[in-house]
């Protein structure tokens, strides 16, 4: 029995010896993994592996010893978690001893120590022992890169798990690491080494007397000068090294006396990258430095920064210089001073003011902006700095404004003033009387009002911005100042067309200031606008002149712009709605553009109300019933219908009202939306008009039952409301509503109504939760579509219903969407519906504005376009190849629409297979196909030049042909593509250069300015092709 057991035990050991022999002597690599796997599975122990290695570990031949230790180390790397404490002790002693061995053995020894540094069972004291042995026995920088990396890994492992033990070494550990790192050149190792240095400092290891040595061993790499080789497999970028080294240099104030002179030297050098790196590093240092570290270097730092901002041609250097100055000032501002200490901030700011003040007064104003930027960078660092600089600079700038008479000079000075005023907004003052602006308020207001009355538009624009900033200062402006300001803004809001930018700025400023000073604007602006509106109504009655018409439009825009406070909305909204009623009641010459302008103002007001729940609900419950009442009244049959009533039912006007209702509904809370829906749905289904103002109508409102097209057209307003509701709002009588919508969607007598019904049905389908009721609605829709698509007068309406239902399901990833898309694809071959089906793919891929929007709470999956592309483009391509010649353009059009709206990163990998079809689409006579395809190709020329250059001959020919297209939009797009072609590799393009330059001479004489502009741009790029520096 004993003999049998011995044989069984000997058999596996024999296998182990065989594997060891194959690795050590046979130089095979595979056995190491096998041995490690056997140890992990429990077939062998580490001790048995050591015994099997036996004499190989003591072999007089270094290479044999190295192979034996390599095998043991590889086993330990895989199995270090299995080791017991006593095994770790013996292995550590063995490996430490082998550090004295032949240099060929050292790499394998280090691998073993790396494995042991990961052991949880490592007894206390051994980490210190290992590192001492490495520091003493190994000349690390003579090792290959991979072995140096192993040493850094050993140190990192011990720092992570044995921090207190290593700290017991005191400064000896720091000195040992300095020796290890000294002379390191490989970027892979430097990243690890910099991280170790950072940890030494941030985790409070003792640096002892070696602070300067540690600084020297890291700062010698500053600034980083490293360019990664092409196709670098390690992926290390120069920026990685820069940031890692910067983290070290800026990690401790103890480096300051060595680092600051170095930074000053590099800022003053001629190397742009060194300047940038130094200024960014200085910026980082200021976060940890105090006055003590900066004190002796402040004059030199200021001189260097000043010189760079004054003299540099690089915007990046200027920006970094200003950022560094800001950080320096912030650092000096936050330092706590002793009572007897010098206030370095005060003296530093005095130097800045002394060097910059006189430039603000120079007649030629050459260094005005650099000086202002420096002063603003310092002033923006702290409240104390801001007060000091502002109180010194503002009197000077105010004086200069009055000294200079030219508008351009005054604009420059006012822009500088504006910069300093904006900085004041950063700081709050408990005692408003201490605010430095108080003493200059009257002068500032006077200066701003002068700017607002200046003939120069540019000066007026700066004046408006300055007024807005002054107004944002709490309790600065008096009531009289505000009254004057409102008067100026009123005047500027009615400027002529050539001052459009000023008018827009004035409207924006009115909105900003009205939110802060609602009483002033209610008292002084709203009454004036109300009067202006009344005058506008009178002019409409008389048949107005164009100038009066434009004033009326300006008034409407001003009313919406100023509606930024709940109290003002309660005044301005009734004015606009009353205006609509007045137009309705009077004998005014109402045009659709007038009503659309009012609706646009209402929509803008609704957008502003979205920020405040109270205003949002007020607008909704006030404006929506009013608009619905006007529309319902307009839809009623009358013997002599008024002009307005006809206007209110026009497509464009209804679309404008849809926009108002949708905007006013999207931000309602579910509770308030639920209140509203109980009124509006019954209005359309049951004719319940009780909640409408002035609801005495001559007949019942029954849009679904009534035969009049006027009432049916108002389904668009129902759509705007119900399709903007939050998803969790329950819609009353939903089943009846969906059936009525479905029935109306296939009514051929009024395309506008049927389309609105189809969109409304689709919008509700998209939000409806999955379940039996949704399935029933879908089945009804499919049956209706199939019935309508047969022969008959409703084919077009059935197709529209199919399209919108498909879109609703595509957006939410509903399983039926693939069947409906396939049905749509089948219609591409239909003689009557084929072109419309092709355009339908544009609708499926586009964002809508009135229904199925994220803002309207529709269920829109993030990557629906990518999914649609993956699921359907192969079928489109296949269908194109199989289609008869007369149908192919429909497939090309559909494909072009899909690709044009696809995110380019998704399209690029598929480009080689699809490009031939896109090029064929350029030959399609349909302008829509051409434009869509050109829009798709232009970004691809910029992002995939290598693929596109394979087809350069075809591209040049087709783009040049299309540059003479009858369609202006196609001509412009073709010329933009010709411009983009110049991004392809120059050698590929040069043979075509003469031909292209000749061909592009023709569109230079195009009758349309925008075409000529693109032609000049494209031809200029082709002229430069191949020239030096291009």
Curated annotation (Swiss-Prot):
**Could you tell me which residues carry N6-acetyllysine?**
496
Q: What is the effect of changing residue 1013 to R?
A: Impairs MAGEF1-NSMCE1-mediated polyubiquitination
The modified positions for Phosphoserine read 1027
Q: How is it modified after translation?
A: Ubiquitinated; undergoes 'Lys-48'-linked polyubiquitination by MAGEF1-NSMCE1 ubiquitin ligase complex leading to proteasomal degradation.
Biological processes annotated in GO: chromosome segregation; DNA repair; protein maturation
Gene Ontology terms: cellular component: centrosome; cytoplasm; cytosol; cytosolic [4Fe-4S] assembly targeting complex; membrane; MMXD complex; nucleoplasm; nucleus
One Pfam family hit: MMS19_N
Q: Which residues carry this modification: N-acetylalanine?
A: 2
Ranges of the HEAT repeats in the UniProt entry: 866-904, 908-946, 949-987, 990-1028
* InterPro entries reported in the protein's UniProt record: ARM-like, ARM-type_fold, MMS19, MMS19_C, MMS19_N
One GO molecular function term? nuclear estrogen receptor binding
Tissue specificity field = Ubiquitously expressed with higher expression in testis.
Note the SS bond partners: none
UniProt entry keywords in alphabetical sequence: Acetylation, Activator, Chromosome partition, Cytoplasm, Cytoskeleton, DNA damage, DNA repair, Nucleus, Phosphoprotein, Repeat, Transcription, Transcription regulation, Ubl conjugation
Record bears the keyword Secreted? no
Q: Where in the cell is it found?
A: Nucleus; Cytoplasm, Cytoskeleton, Spindle; Cytoplasm, Cytoskeleton, Microtubule organizing center, Centrosome
At the top level, the lineage of the source is: Eukaryota
Tell me the function of this protein.
Key component of the cytosolic iron-sulfur protein assembly (CIA) complex, a multiprotein complex that mediates the incorporation of iron-sulfur cluster into apoproteins specifically involved in DNA metabolism and genomic integrity. In the CIA complex, MMS19 acts as an adapter between early-acting CIA components and a subset of cellular target iron-sulfur proteins such as ERCC2/XPD, FANCJ and RTEL1, thereby playing a key role in nucleotide excision repair (NER), homologous recombination-mediated double-strand break DNA repair, DNA replication and RNA polymerase II (POL II) transcription.
- Which protein family is named in the record? Belongs to the MET18/MMS19 family.
Quaternary form? Component of the CIA complex. In the CIA complex, interacts directly with CIAO2B and CIAO3. Component of the MMXD complex, composed of CIAO1, ERCC2, CIAO2B, MMS19 and SLC25A5. Interacts with CIAO2B; the interaction is direct. Interacts with ERCC2/XPD; the interaction is direct. Interacts with ERCC3/XPB and NCOA3/RAC3. Interacts with RTEL1; the interaction mediates the association of RTEL1 with the CIA complex. Interacts with BRIP1.
Protein name according to UniProt: MMS19 nucleotide excision repair protein homolog
**Source species, please?**
Homo sapiens (Human)
């Amino acid at each position: 029995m004993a003999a049998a057991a011995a044989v069984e035990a000997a058999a596996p050991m024999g296998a182990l010896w065989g594997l060891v022999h194959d690795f050590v002597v046979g130089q095979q690599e595979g056995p190491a993994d096998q041995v490690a796997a056997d140890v992990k599975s429990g077939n062998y122990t580490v001790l048995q592996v050591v015994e099997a290695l036996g004499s190989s570990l003591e072999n007089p031949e270094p290479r044999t010893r190295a192979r034996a230790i390599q095998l043991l180390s590889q086993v330990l790397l895989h199995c270090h978690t299995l080791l017991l404490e006593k095994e770790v002790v013996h292995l550590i002693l063995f490996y430490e001893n082998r550090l004295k061995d032949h240099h060929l053995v050292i790499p394998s020894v280090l691998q073993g120590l790396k494995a042991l540094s990961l052991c949880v069972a490592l007894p206390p004291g051994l980490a210190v022992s290992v590192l001492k042995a490495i520091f003493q026995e190994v000349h690390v920088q003579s090792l290959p890169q991979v072995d140096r990396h192993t040493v850094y890994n050993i140190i990192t492992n011990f720092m992570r798990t044995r921090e207190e033990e290593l700290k017991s070494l005191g400064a000896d550990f720091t000195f040992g690491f300095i020796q290890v790192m000294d002379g390191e050149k490989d970027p892979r190792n430097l990243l690890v080494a910099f991280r170790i240095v950072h940890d030494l400092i941030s985790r409070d290891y003792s640096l002892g007397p070696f602070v300067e040595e540690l600084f020297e061993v890291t700062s010698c790499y500053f600034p980083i000068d490293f360019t990664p080789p092409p196709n670098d497999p390690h992926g290390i970028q120069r920026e990685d090294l820069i940031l890692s080294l910067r983290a070290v240099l800026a990690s401790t104030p103890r480096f300051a006396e060595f680092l600051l002179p170095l930074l000053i030297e590099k800022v003053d050098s001629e190397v742009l990258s060194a300047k940038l790196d130094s200024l960014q590093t200085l910026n980082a240092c200021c976060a940890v430095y105090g006055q003590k570290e900066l004190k002796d270097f402040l004059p030199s730092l200021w001189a260097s920064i000043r010189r760079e901002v004054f003299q540099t041609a690089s915007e990046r250097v200027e920006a970094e210089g200003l950022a560094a100055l800001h950080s320096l000032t912030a650092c000096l501002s936050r330092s706590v001073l002793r009572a007897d200490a010098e206030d370095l901030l005060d003296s530093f700011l005095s130097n800045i003011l002394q060097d910059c003040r006189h430039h603000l007064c120079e007649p030629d104003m050459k260094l005005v902006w650099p000086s202002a930027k420096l002063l603003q960078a310092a002033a923006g660092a702290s409240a104390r700095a801001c007060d000091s600089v502002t109180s010194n600079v503002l009197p000077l700038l105010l004086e200069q404004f009055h000294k200079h008479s030219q508008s351009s000079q005054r604009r420059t000075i006012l822009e500088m003033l504006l910069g300093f005023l904006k900085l004041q907004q950063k700081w709050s003052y408990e005692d408003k009387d201490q605010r430095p602006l108080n003493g200059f308020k009257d002068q500032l207001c006077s200066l701003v009002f002068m700017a607002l009355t200046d003939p120069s538009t540019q000066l007026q624009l700066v004046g408006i911005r300055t007024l807005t900033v002054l107004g944002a200062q709490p309790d600065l402006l008096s009531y009289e100042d505000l009254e004057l300001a409102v008067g100026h803004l009123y005047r500027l809001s009615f400027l002529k067309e050539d001052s459009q930018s000023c008018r827009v700025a004035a409207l924006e400023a009115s909105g900003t200031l009205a939110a802060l000073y609602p009483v002033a604007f209610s008292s002084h602006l709203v009454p004036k606008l109300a009067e202006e509106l009344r005058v506008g109504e009178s002019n409409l009655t008389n048949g107005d002149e164009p100038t009066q018409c434009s004033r009326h439009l300006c008034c409407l825009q001003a009313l919406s712009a100023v509606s930024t406070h709940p109290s003002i909305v309660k005044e301005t909204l009734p004015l606009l709605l009353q205006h609509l009623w007045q137009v309705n009641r009077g004998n005014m010459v109402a045009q659709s553009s007038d009503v659309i302008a009012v609706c646009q103002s209402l929509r803008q007001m609704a957008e502003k109300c979205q920020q405040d729940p109270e205003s949002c609900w007020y607008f909704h419950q006030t404006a929506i019933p009013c608009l619905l009442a006007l529309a319902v009244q307009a839809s009623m049959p009358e013997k002599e219908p008024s002009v307005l009533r006809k206007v209110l039912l026009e497509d464009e006007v209804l679309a404008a009202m849809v926009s108002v209702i949708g905007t006013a509904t999207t931000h309602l809370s579910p509770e308030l939306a639920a209140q509203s829906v109980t009124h509006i749905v019954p209005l359309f289904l049951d004719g319940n008009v009780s909640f409408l103002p002035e609801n005495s109508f001559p007949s019942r409102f029954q849009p679904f039952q009534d035969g009049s097209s006027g009432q049916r057209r108002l389904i668009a307003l129902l759509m705007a409301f119900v399709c903007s509701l939050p998803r969790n709002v329950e819609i009353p009588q939903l089943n009846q509503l969906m059936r009525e919508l479905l029935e109306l969607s296939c009514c051929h007598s009024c395309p506008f109504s049927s389309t609105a019904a189809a969109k409304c049905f689709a919008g509700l389908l998209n939000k409806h939760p999955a379940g039996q009721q949704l399935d029933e609605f879908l089945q009804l829709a499919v049956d209706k579509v199939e019935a309508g698509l047969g022969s008959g007068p409703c084919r077009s309406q059935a197709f529209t219903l199919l399209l919108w239902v498909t879109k609703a399901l595509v957006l939410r990833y509903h399983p039926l969407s693939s069947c409906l898309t396939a049905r749509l694809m089948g219609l591409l071959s239909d003689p009557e519906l084929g072109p419309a089906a092709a355009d339908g793919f544009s609708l499926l891929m586009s964002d809508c504005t009135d229904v199925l929007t994220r803002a309207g709470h529709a269920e829109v999956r993030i990557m629906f376009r990518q999914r649609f592309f993956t699921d359907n483009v192969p079928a489109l391509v296949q269908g194109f190849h199989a289609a008869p010649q007369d149908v192919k353009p429909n497939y090309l059009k559909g494909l072009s629409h899909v690709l044009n709206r696809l995110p380019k990163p998704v399209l690029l990998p598929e480009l080689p297979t699809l490009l031939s079809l896109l090029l064929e689409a350029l030959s399609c006579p349909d302008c829509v196909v051409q434009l869509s395809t050109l829009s798709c190709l232009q970004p691809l020329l910029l992002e995939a030049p290598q693929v596109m250059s394979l087809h350069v001959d075809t591209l040049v020919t087709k783009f040049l042909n299309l540059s003479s297209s009858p369609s202006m939009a196609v001509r412009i797009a073709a010329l933009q593509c010709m411009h983009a072609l110049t991004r392809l590799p120059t050698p590929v393009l040069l043979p075509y250069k003469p031909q292209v330059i000749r061909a592009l001479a023709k569109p230079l004489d195009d009758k349309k300015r925008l075409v000529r502009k693109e032609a000049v741009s494209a031809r200029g790029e082709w002229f430069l092709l191949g020239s030096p520096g291009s």
